[in-house]
């Protein structure tokens, strides 16, 4: 159905997560990072945005192209498993408490996962349906609603995590959460939409120019600004946060004006 809503929401969420929420974290709190973990996931985020942009330049994410993007998700899962094993080994070395592996704990976490997934499906349907109606009422394209209001709405969990991290002074928690959410948005949500449709994901003709030449490049740009200087200098800076936030505000302004 709402192709513009799906694409705009995924791309807009990544841009909002990085340009607004990560920016706020960097401005208000010095962020300590595990460079070995950040570098791989950060590069994967940048590569994912660039690959998606290149594949969609003709206005279509075809089924074979969807498989290429999904392959990046597989790499993300492999990296998560690798880093989790390494972290677990370090914790055992430090004498940390072992995670409760009882059947009761497993069932509890499984139930919470299913409940969370169900709420996510219901919430996503409400966002898309009401976003479409809102676009019609305001007389604007679904893309504009998707990359601004819907994207910010779906980024609220990351915003809550960022605020909690700032209050508790646990900055790395916020950054790690944002990286993971961004990679998932790009590498699984859009490819799955393309596969479910049966013939790929087609950007609406009236939105191709803005999506391919504004939304996706901006998404790649904020990802690059968040990642590349950090890897080169081995730390985040407040200047990065200010630049990211300024770019995001400018992007939203341009988006609603064109």
What are these regions (language model features)?
Residues 1-258:
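Hydrophobic alpha-helical segments, chiefly the membrane-spanning helices
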């Amino acid at each position: 159905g709402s192709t513009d809503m799906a694409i705009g929401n995924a791309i807009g969420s990544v841009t909002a997560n990085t340009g607004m929420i990560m920016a706020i974290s960097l401005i208000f709190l010095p962020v300590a990072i595990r460079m070995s973990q950040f570098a791989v996931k950060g590069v994967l985020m940048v590569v994912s945005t660039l690959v998606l942009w290149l594949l969609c330049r003709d206005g279509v994410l075809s089924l074979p192209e969807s498989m290429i993007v999904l392959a990046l998700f597989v790499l993300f899962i492999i990296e998560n498993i690798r880093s989790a094993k390494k972290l677990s080994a370090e914790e055992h070395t430090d004498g940390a408490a072992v995670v409760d592996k009882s059947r009761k704990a497993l069932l509890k976490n499984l139930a919470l996962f299913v409940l969370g997934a169900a709420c996510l499906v219901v919430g996503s349907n409400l966002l898309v349906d009401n976003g479409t109606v809102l676009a019609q009422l305001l007389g604007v394209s679904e893309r504009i609603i998707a990359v601004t209001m819907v994207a910010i709405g779906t980024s609220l969990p990351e915003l809550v995590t960022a605020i909690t991290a700032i209050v508790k002074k646990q900055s790395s928690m916020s950054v790690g959460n944002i990286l993971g959410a961004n990679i998932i948005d790009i590498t699984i949500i859009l490819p799955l939409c393309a596969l479910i449709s049966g013939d790929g994901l087609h950007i609406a003709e009236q939105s191709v120019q803005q999506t391919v030449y504004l939304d996706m490049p901006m998404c790649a740009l904020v990802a690059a600004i968040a990642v590349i200087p950090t890897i080169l200098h081995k730390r985040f800076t407040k200047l990065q946060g200010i630049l990211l936030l300024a770019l995001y505000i400018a992007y939203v302004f341009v988006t609603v004006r064109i």
